[in-house]
Amino acid sequence: MKTHIIKNLIFVGLLGFLLSSCQDKYFEDSGIHDAVYDGTVMDYIKNRPDVFDSLNTIIQLSGLESVLDQEGVTFFAPGDPSIRKALYELNENLFAIGRDTVLTLDQVDPSVWREYLSMYIYNDTYVLKDIPQLDTLNMNIFPGQGFISYGGQNMNIGVNYNDVISENSSGQKQVVKYAGYRQLFLSYILDISNVGSFGSIINAPVASSDIRTTNGVIHALEYRRHTFGFSSANFINSAYSKGIIYK
């Protein structure tokens, strides 16, 4: 029991350090990229271990590398901190029920990684200008667009048009609706029968969009506002039901 507690404390401490040491290099609102990367989507991921080291590992574990090398693919890339957050919440759950925690990514069943990673992959190439407007507070008017992910999951993709807010000479706030910067969103639909109602979708904003490669495009998700898998409860249930691989 003492060994079990020490292992968990070491893991939680290490994970906390990793999360706190994340730098701005993790694609924090860096805008739209026009240059074409000389390589495939998978090549780009492999060549950015500073951002996508854990992501590269779970791609290998899930067997999806060939999919990201195929012609015509769009990948909403979750940064490593998003993956660490999902593992942290899984380990909190395991610790609460007296189970040993996950120390390495390969302790989660590969089918779980494949199921949830497939939510971020789309056949064909979609850049920001291809996607309709999304207003998460007014989806009846600006709903974005429904998409089916590579894994068959109902998802929504849209572009949020931010407002321009300023003050006039009298100090009164002035708002110009939808005149600000545009930001791409990938959203998980919780309730397909009631899209647009409060709490019906979970949004993942994109920090850096339109990273073009020789076979497709990457949109890097904003790690501070996203946890891998969108729903921590779903990810935890899947990982637990498939069985943690203890070594």
Please provide the spans of the model-predicted regions:
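Bacterial N-terminal signal peptides that target proteins for export
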Residues: 1-10
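Mature, structured domains of secreted/extracytosolic soluble proteins
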Residues: 22-247
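Hydrophobic alpha-helical membrane-embedded or membrane-associated segments
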Residues: 12-15
